[in-house]
């Protein structure tokens, strides 16, 4: 799935509303919280985000074609930011380390240890500061980036998928 920080409302709504056992009130609360967290992207400062998407998320019709066009457009907008590095892990990549779900590792300036934010549909999204877990996620991210398409190739693929979703 597209990481929660990058999801448009229709995409997030489709994912959350279809989770078994979730009431409509729970879905609305989770949706509001997810969209509220996206304000982090608007904060001033030098934060940098490195994002790797599995190619499958570009093909899977979450919310339908209109939502997918909007989602592709959002990914392209974010990728144009000097603070975002966006890559796609292609189907042909050998490794499966990136198929375990989305996560964000935040490294703070100064002495503070890094923390991880882990997206989950089956449980509440969570933040971890457990050293072993964060180190494992940092290592996993390095492996995923090495197997991913270049930034230019990734943007080209997202543009192509946006064209496909519009036809």
Model-derived regions: residue spans:
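Hydrophobic protein-protein interaction segments
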Residues: 1-167
